[in-house]
Amino acid sequence: MIQDQANDLLAMKKTFTKSKWKPEEDRILKDYVIQYGDRTWTHVPKRTGLPHNPASCRFRWMNHLKPSLKKGPFTDEEEKRVLQLHAVLGNKWSQMAREFPGRTDNEIKNFWNARRMRLKGKGLPVYPDEVREQAIRTAAQYGVKVELLNAHYSQDSLMAGNVEKPQELNNLALNQCSPYYQSTLANVQPSRNRVMEPETTFPFTGGSAMNEQNPTLLCNPYVESTQEQLPDSHLFGNVTYSSPPMPLIHEVENLELPSFQGFDFHEEPSSFGAEQYNPMLNLEPHNTLVQSPLIGQTPTDFPSSFYDELLDELLESVVNGSLGEIPKTDTSSESQLFQSSLRSHTDATPDIANTTGYVGSNERNTTNDDDWIRLLLDEGFI
């Protein structure tokens, strides 16, 4: 028997259509409900032969064919009553329909949505002030929570576009840190994943050398700046520096080398007799990527070009196998330095000659013309 009912329902579904109701179909449905009542809608399509499903037959009867239905637009009293009930009940359309004989829940919902969209387009509030005040008193009388009413009112006000901007937002500056934000960040431990500090300065730069950052970084609690008077401050002045509180990634504290643009390595000692202060000697590279070698001071008695020219002439004479003219100097200091340089080059020239492959050591020892050391001795340099 259950199988037969299932087959009948399946056969009925195949015959159902989603077409509009015709006047002849409305007449057949109305006569059937008046004769048999509106209790059972499952057998209506089968008994009447209508090509509509039971739900469609019921909806058609309840919203269009029922004799007690009230047709036409809502009156002023009905509209005011809808506003009062909606302010308290919200979107409970079935409960609201009980207060309106002849009006269905679907009709009340359509009326409310159409009115709300119309007022929203004009920028007017959905609830009048007197309706809202009366709804609050009614809610308090029947024990309805006022918070629920305020929620409905604020929601409809937002949908109507009646939102005013607070005055406090007009005076709010960009990137402004509140005291609560600063006090909260002050207790946060610095992260170990920071690559660079917002403020990077180095000592021995003749003042404060820092990387200017965005002013918004002033709210960063990890930046700590201190001013200390270093030894021999008359050479460098006040130096401002900041050290990172925690190691950086891969135990690298800084990715940049210090700059010594303003420091003169050839500066004479001060008149007070103090030893010349070399900042390179006090730098202790620790866990850095590149370590700079120490740079010593070169003597300033002769220019560096003098040694370059002398070395070029000596190398040219060894390679070509002939001795060129060597400039003579009159000063005693120059001759002494020149003699010491020649002695140092006499030890290095045989190796250079052998590596070049032009002049052999045996040929240089047997030939008197190539004995340039003896010629130098004859000239009186040594």
From Swiss-Prot:
Annotated region of DNA binding: 41-65, 93-116
UniProt cross-references to Pfam families, sorted A to Z: Myb_DNA-binding
Disulfide links within the chain: none
GO molecular function list: DNA binding; DNA-binding transcription factor activity
Origin species: Arabidopsis thaliana (Mouse-ear cress)
Gene: MYB104
Any one annotated GO CC term: nucleus
Disordered: region residues: 326-364
A biological process from GO: regulation of DNA-templated transcription
Top-level taxonomy: Eukaryota, Viridiplantae, Streptophyta, Embryophyta, Tracheophyta
Keywords: DNA-binding, Nucleus, Repeat, Transcription, Transcription regulation
Domain HTH myb-type per the UniProt entry, residue ranges: 13-69, 70-120
Bias type Polar residues, positions: 329-343, 352-364
Location in the cell: Nucleus
Residues of the signal peptide: none
InterPro entries xrefs: Homeodomain-like_sf, Myb_dom, SANT/Myb
Record's protein name: Transcription factor MYB104
